[in-house]
Structure formats: structure tokens, C-alpha cells
Amino acid sequence: MAMRDLVNGGAACAVPGSSSSSNPLGALTNALLGSSSKTQERLKEIPNANRSGPRPQFYSEDQQIRSLPGSELDQPLLQPGAQGSEFFRGFRSVDQNGLGAAWDEVQQGGPMPPMGPMFEPVQPTFEGPPQRVLSNFLHSFVESSRGGIPFRPAPVPVLGLSQSDKQCIRDRSSIMARHFFADRGEEFINSQVNALLSSLDIDDGIQARGHVPGRFRELDDYWNESQAVVKPNLHPADNWAAEFNQHGMDHGGPDSWVQSFEQQHGVNGWATEFEQGQSQLMSSQMRSMDMQNIAAMEQTRKLAHTLSQDGNPKFQNSRFLQFVSKMSRGELIIDENQVKQASAPGEWATEYEQQYLGPPSWADQFANEKLSHGPEQWADEFASGRGQQETAEDQWVNEFSKLNVDDWIDEFAEGPVGDSSADAWANAYDEFLNEKNAGKQTSGVYVFSDMNPYVGHPEPMKEGQELFRKGLLSEAALALEAEVMKNPENAEGWRLLGVTHAENDDDQQAIAAMMRAQEADPTNLEVLLALGVSHTNELEQATALKYLYGWLRNHPKYGAIAPPELADSLYHADIARLFNEASQLNPEDADVHIVLGVLYNLSREFDRAITSFQTALQLKPNDYSLWNKLGATQANSVQSADAISAYQQALDLKPNYVRAWANMGISYANQGMYKESIPYYVRALAMNPKADNAWQYLRLSLSCASRQDMIEACESRNLDLLQKEFPL
């Protein structure tokens, strides 16, 4: 039905002697609630629908007066001695006959007792069959929209509405109110709808403000008697039609209705309403997609946590684990049956504006093209829009139901990271598993370089120390290898070689060198502490605890507090307790605080670890490796900005500190600043091209920064091209 028909009505007159009518508000009522015949059938189905009886008296004497219709408007203006209260007390002060006489006097329009000025009635009273009462009631609701005044309904009799009728009125009145009061605020619209629903006793738990049968039994009796008197001159339906026609003539006829409606709800108003509906629909769909992505994030978060327990550094930096980690952090999402990079808030907002809000404005186009014939087409457009919405939602559900895990893994294999097929991912995963198993078998075995120009050098140890001091770590490692090949029992040579590999971001070689140093000198405290730190970096807690306990057991100051029998059953809590005792014995020992920081990193108590390292830095402020440990702990504690500051302190003390350069890049990447992280990885690799972990980090940042054009250079390890493209 077009809106013009709802507003203008047809040319035919009401059918005499019946309740059917072609008047616009009658049609509007039928459009909202269905025809009167259907309503009468529903009323007949309700058992005892018209039965009313006395209800329990649960109001006090004063509450009965305040609960009369309209009393909520009068209450702020009436004082305890006001004439309104005296009027009601007059009713209660007489006997039954006196009450009847007073009521007859009111009905006959006799002179009223002197009263102060009251509010003029805004809405008429309603009487007649339920369908006619409801039609008049909704008519008054529509009238309030034209006048722009708050809807203050008069009491209505019990209509016997079914639950489906109430639901229909609740839903449609809310929709129509937003059309009628489009130029008013949301608070006004809600108050209008609430007043309508409350008067019809629709909302559960809301006490109706209208007349409630049973509160005033005497007045109910007179009400029922007055309703039994039917005026003989006009049929009720004809009377209604006559009143409406007279009202239409008084207000200028149908044309003035259309003009008034267009003024209040013109083209722009409907375009705005439609735009809001579309925005809400899109938000709902986005929330549905977000829920699915949240579920995927939760599953991958559990998987990532399980995989992260593995200690192999190459597996920790594998592309498979990186993929799972990015899914768990929400950096990858499922969209249109594909795995895609999650857009930043600014990006999707810009995309939305370009697609839906860009010039020419779709709202203006909608207003010019779709509503060029006035408001009579709005009903058809609204029905069509609803059908399209439901179709779109069904299609989305059907598409998502077809999604399976294998599909999105295959899509990702060709997506953000840049591999050409899913087989590449499977092969890469198998490769890292093999390396993981091989790493366990060869753990502790030092691998010498194939080509070493320092073999045969007269003083390789001295040369290695000088190169290490200059920060040329790769060259220093070669010189120190030549030294330990010449003197295999040189514990200091092995120790310095292990330190060089650790600073060069190669913990596996560092551990192997330190183990050879321990074989040569089992009680060397620096070696034991370095082994504990390296195994902590490899997430090997049990082994790390063994070496840290060995450091305490062999220390001349603290050996007495470390019982020998504890070595058979090492627990983190016991070791931490012993080192806390040591810190109390000697608070000025920076090494004790360093070990405590390492222990708290093992238990992931990062705040306590940060405190321990900061205490140690107060004692050794120029220890660049200690600044690096603090930065790594802050990064693990999701304090990447603070970590960058700590790494910078380490680099200021030692500019060629490869591990600090790589860690700086990791901190930027953890903040989503992938473009900024790339130059730091390139700088670290320029100083140590053999740092496999740094190559993996660089490749990931290139992919996340959408620099697929440089991935080939990363794969071929073309440092010249990378340094030229990403200078620092």
C-alpha cells in the first residue's frame, strides 16, 4: 500500500451500518494490526476476554487519588488543601445515594464546584467495541504527531488483546513513531511510544497510567452503566466516519494532510532514515564477522601457546608458527572465504567512506531518483529493502557455512606471506620439524666454520679479543675459533667465543661453546651464568635452573645456603628463594640481581624481572648486555616502547651489538610498525649475515609492510640491495 493512500484515503465513503471505512486512519489501523474481523476472531478465541471483576485493594487512600488518570500531571501543582483533593474527599464523605447523585450531576453537565484552572484535555475519551476503540486510540496517537505535542492518552477499556496483537502493536508503533517524529529527538520518540504501550498495558512490568478496573468499584459501575446506553441516532461506525469527515473538513481536507506530511517527512528525512538503517545493517554484519574471527583467534591462541613451549629457536621463528601467531593476535582474519591481512582502523574507515559515502552522495541520488514522485512510493521501497536485507543475510550465512579450515589454510599459502602454493608451507613445516629434531641431537656440538683465515695466526686469542672490543663479532668468532682449535682446553677462549656468539644472536653456537668451556673449567662462575641465560633464551627451564643453581653452589659467598641434596630435584620456587636470600646477604652484588631477573623471566613474572634488572643497572650502569636484558624483558611484558629505549642505551654503549639491533626491530614489529622495523633487521644482518633468526624476522616484516617486491632479495640474501632500499 502506498503512503499517499494511507494519508489521503479513497474517494468512497464509509459503508453505512458497518465498521468498514476507506478513511485513511482506519486503513492505517488495519495496516498496523490487521482487519477488524481478524481482531474480533482473536478476541473470541481468548477465554473470558471481556470478563472484569474486582481486584485486590493494594493502594492506600492517598494512592487511590494519585492513581487516577491524569493525576501524574496534576500532582506537582496541587497542594494538600487543593480543591481537587476536596472534590475526591467529597465523594467519599457521602453515602451510596450521594455518590450516585454527584455522578449524575457530572454526567448531565451541571455546574461544577469552583476549581482552579486545569489542563485542557489533550486526547478524547474512547468508547465502543474494541476495534473502534483501538482505531480511535491510534488516531489520537497520529494526531499528536501532527501537533508536535507529547502524547497523553486518555483511559481505554480492557481490549482483550492477545500476545500476538501486543507484539504487533509494539513493533509497528516503534517503527511508525520514528517516521512521524523524524524531526524530534530520540528521547521524545521513546516517550511517545512508551505512553502508547503503557496505556494499552502492553509492556510487561510497566504499570498502566490509565484507568485500571477494580481500583474504584463505584466508578467502574457507573462507567459500565454509561457504556450500556447506545445513542440511537447513528450507528457507531457511521458516527466515527462522520466525526472523521468533519475533522478532515476542519483541517483543510486530504491535500493539506499530504502537504503537512511532506513538510514533516520530506525527501531528505526519508533518505536519512534509510541511510541509518543501512548503517545499522552493515554494523550487524560486521559484528557477525567479528564473532567468527574472535572464535578463530581463540583457537589459534591456544595452538600458538602450545607450540611456543617448544625450545628450538628455528621452529620458534618458522613461518608456520608465525602464521599461527598472527592469527591469534588478529593480524589475519577470515574474509570472503579467504585469509587476509586485518586492516587498520583508519584504513577500513577510509574504505567505507569511499564506497558508501563518497561523492556523489548516494543519499542525494536516492532522494532525486527514488523519491522524485513524492512519499507515495516509500512503502514499496521499504518492503523491497527489507527483502534485499534478508536475502543478503541468508547468502552470507550460506557462504560462511561452506567455509572449512583446509580452504583458508590453502588461501593463506598464496596470500599475505607470498608463497606460491600450499605445498611450500607443508614442506617448510616439515623442514623446521627436521631441524628441530636435528637440533636436539646435535645440541652441545660446536660447528666450526669451513673457511677460517685466522687458522695459523700467531696470536689468535689476542686478535679475537681486539676484534670483539671493536664490535666486529663475526671476525672475532673466527679468530677465537682458531684459538680453541689450537688450544682445546682454553676455558677462557671457549667462554669468550660463547659470549661472541650470544651477542651475535646465535644461542645454539653460544651454548655449545660454553659447554666446552665448562668441561675445561666446571666451576667457572661466568660460564655457569652465561649457560643459564642462554638456556633461558631457548626456553629450556630445567637446564637453565641446573646451571643457575650451579652458579650459586660454586659461589664462595653463597655456597653455604645452597644444600647439595637440592641438585637432585630442582624447582623454580626453591631456586628463586635461595637467590632472594643471597640478595639479602649481599644487596650490592649485581650478579645476584641479574640471576633473579633471569629466574623471573623463566616464570614469566616480568614485572619482578624488570625490577631486578633495574636494581642491577644501578650497580652496573655501563653494562650494555644488562640494558639488552632489560629491554627484552620489557618487550615480553608488552612494553615495547620502553624496550626500545633500553635497547638504545645498549647500542649507545656498544654500537655493533647485533642482538640489540635485531631486538630493536622486534620491538617495532610488536607495535605493528613493520616498515620501521625493517632497517634495524638489515643493520643487524649487515654485521652478521649468518643470523638466520634475523632473516626470518626481516621476511615477516617485509610481508606485513606490503613490500613483496623485496622478498626475493631477502630470499637470496642480497644485503647490498636491502641496505640501499632500507638505509638507517
Swiss-Prot record:
A motif (WxxxF/Y motif 2) lies at residues 257-261. Sequence repeats lie at residues 240-244, 257-261, 270-274, 348-352, 362-366, 378-382, 396-400, 408-412, 425-429. It is found in: Cytoplasm, Cytosol; Peroxisome matrix. It holds the Pfam family TPR_16. Keywords: Cytoplasm, Peroxisome, Peroxisome biogenesis, Protein transport, Receptor, Repeat, Thioester bond, TPR repeat, Translocation, Transport, Ubl conjugation. Its main location: cytoplasm. One of its GO terms (cellular component) is peroxisomal matrix. There is a cross-link at residue 13 (Glycyl cysteine thioester (Cys-Gly) (interchain with G-Cter in ubiquitin)). Monoubiquitinated at Cys-13 by PEX2 during PEX5 passage through the retrotranslocation channel. Cys-13 monoubiquitination acts as a recognition signal for the PEX1-PEX6 complex and is required for PEX5 extraction and export from peroxisomes. When PEX5 recycling is compromised, polyubiquitinated by PEX10 during its passage through the retrotranslocation channel, leading to its degradation. Disulfide bonds: none annotated. A motif (WxxxF/Y motif 9) lies at residues 425-429. InterPro entries: PEX5/PEX5L, TPR-like_helical_dom_sf, TPR_rpt. One of its GO terms (biological process) is protein targeting to peroxisome. Residues 392-417 are annotated as: Amphipathic helix 4 (AH4). A motif (WxxxF/Y motif 5) lies at residues 362-366. Residues 288-311 are annotated as: Amphipathic helix 3 (AH3). A motif (WxxxF/Y motif 3) lies at residues 270-274. A motif (WxxxF/Y motif 4) lies at residues 348-352. Expressed in flowers, siliques, leaves and roots. Disruption phenotype: Peroxisome-defective phenotype including an absolute requirement for sucrose during early development, high seedling lethality, and delayed development. Residues 1-58 are annotated as: Disordered. PANTHER family: GH08708P, PEROXISOMAL TARGETING SIGNAL 1 RECEPTOR PEX5. The TPR repeats mediate interaction with proteins containing a C-terminal PTS1-type tripeptide peroxisomal targeting signal (SKL-type). The WxxxF/Y motifs mediate interaction with PEX14, promoting association with the PEX13-PEX14 docking complex. PEX5 stability in light-grown seedlings depends on PEX7. Interacts (via WxxxF/Y and LVxEF motifs) with PEX14; promoting translocation through the PEX13-PEX14 docking complex. Interacts with PEX7, promoting peroxisomal import of proteins containing a C-terminal PTS2-type peroxisomal targeting signal. Interacts with LACS7. This is Peroxisome biogenesis protein 5. It comes from Arabidopsis thaliana.
